[in-house]
Amino acid sequence: MSSTEPRVAILLGTYNGERYLRLQMDSFIRQSYKNWVLYISDDGSKDQTRAILNEYQKIHGADKIILFEGPCKGCAANYASLISRADIDESYALYADQDDVWLDDKIERTMEFLTAQDQSQAALYMAASIHIDHNGNIIGASALRPRTPSFKNALLQNIAGGNTFGLNKAALDIIRATKDAAVLYPDWWIYIAVSASGGALYYDPKACMLYRQHETNMIGANRGLAAKLWRVKELFFGSYNVLIWQNVTALKTYPFLWTNESNKLITQCEALRAPSRLTRLKAWFSLGLYRQSVFEDIAMLIRILI
């Protein structure tokens, strides 16, 4: 890939990541798309993470790998600090996690979509992933996403990990403008915000990376019966419903960023928590909200009605 291609910012947050960091760093170096710069915010690592990063910076140059001190307020705040930096001014950015391994064409495929869009509008690339365990053994893949991504889907679920995301400048500007949004899951918020703005969305069904699974994300990220049952349990007995309305409340804070159609839908969503079950039922069918399977649609409808 020629250096005349647009320069891409890779945004990486690190914290005590020495165990897998070299594998991820090497996967950046192997990318078929070469015109990138890696911005790393280290959140006060106590292990050899900084030494490893300094080693790669020495080999590849301080203009290729740029290190910052993180705010030491947790993972979400670390990434928020990265995307908010005025000195990161590339027109395209990809998020990365320290434990993963990118496939060699990840940036190239992301940029094929992003550069083809109207750059005055936000654009978001998302993708499937191959799941690996702590030893790098393949243990599965991300759930199938057969339905078209849209705001009506984003209101009910996130469909991809933020570690697969690629954004253009218009999308980055929206995320920067909403950096104080009171939401729990920044990845989900990116999908919501870009879609609410009328931005271009693409979910690539071809895996772009090896996503390392840990005990904390093993069930939620995998597909299959266990994952479906886990999601249904969260829907009925967990905080899922609270999260949806938290996101809706956050959306109401920034109406000037969304399309008229999106703002109308945000207002109409209130009918889904009306006292009358009949009102909620009518609202469900009139709004056209959906998840990625009929099974999950039915579960969502039942949750709304009880």
Segments the model singles out, each with a brief description of its role:
Residues 189, 212-306:
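C-terminal subregions of glycosyltransferases and related glycan-biosynthesis enzymes
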Residues 1-224, 305:
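Nucleotide-sugar donor-binding/catalytic module of glycosyltransferases
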